[in-house]
Regions:
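Short, surface-exposed ligand- or partner-binding patches at beta-edge/loop junctions that are enriched
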Residues: 127
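Rhodanese-like catalytic fold shared by cysteine-dependent sulfurtransferases
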Residues: 19-63, 68-71, 84-123, 133-174
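Hydrophobic alpha-helical transmembrane segments of integral membrane proteins
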Residues: 8-9
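N-terminal signal peptide c-region/cleavage motif recognized by signal peptidases
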Residues: 12-14
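Positively charged n-region of N-terminal signal peptides that target proteins for export
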Residues: 1-4
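Short hydrophobic beta-strand that contains or immediately precedes a catalytic carboxylate
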Residues: 76-81
Length: 174
């Protein structure tokens, strides 16, 4: 009987301790700090919630991102915007892109992941326009075995290439 009572008390505790936590991939909104108990969609930014444990990538400001490019010439730059946004042919403002960046639209990343396999041992620096797609792409890279993934918070829309020598050196304005 004592064993039964002990089991009744311990089972709920072990079940509770295994409960997954879900979060919105960092998008620079207040919802970045909210933790949910089940999968779904963020009510604020409408991004798909991900397991909190999957967010094992580093987030850097634009200035820190540029410094990382300077200090790590072997890093791979991954622009996850559309081809039109990347090359400046889109109908809306496209801002520009980092020199030597690889462009794979986040919508195509899952099926094109194999193109990046040769870079698994290198640091991958991921960016987009407003830091909405790049956190999603960063999480996908981590889920696919990439261990050194860095996301640029804010996106290229926050860049003023005239204000920083590093950005003038590495960023192409459309």
């Amino acid at each position: 009987m004592k064993l039964f009572l002990l089991l009744v008390l311990l089972v709920p505790i072990s079940v509770l301790s295994q409960t997954k936590e879900y979060v919105c991939p960092p998008c620079n909104h207040s919802c970045d700090e909210v933790v949910y108990s089940k999968p779904g969609t963020c009510p604020d930014c409408h991004m798909t919630l991900v397991a909190k444990s999957s967010l094992r990538y580093e987030n850097l400001t634009v200035d820190e991102f540029c410094e990382r490019i300077s200090s790590n010439p072997n890093a791979v730059l991954l622009d996850v915007r559309s081809k039109g946004e990347f090359d400046g042919s889109a109908w809306r403002s496209t801002y520009g892109h980092f020199k030597n960046a690889i462009n794979i639209n986040v919508e195509e990343l899952e099926e094109r992941m194999g193109e990046l396999d040769k870079y698994k041992d290198r640091e991958i620096l991921v960016y987009c326009s407003h830091s909405i797609r790049s956190p999603r792409a960063s999480a996908m890279l981590i889920e696919n075995g990439f261990e050194r993934v860095v996301n640029m918070s804010g996106g290229v829309s926050t860049i003023d290439p005239k204000s920083d020598e590093c950005l003038r050196k590495y960023f192409v304005v459309h």
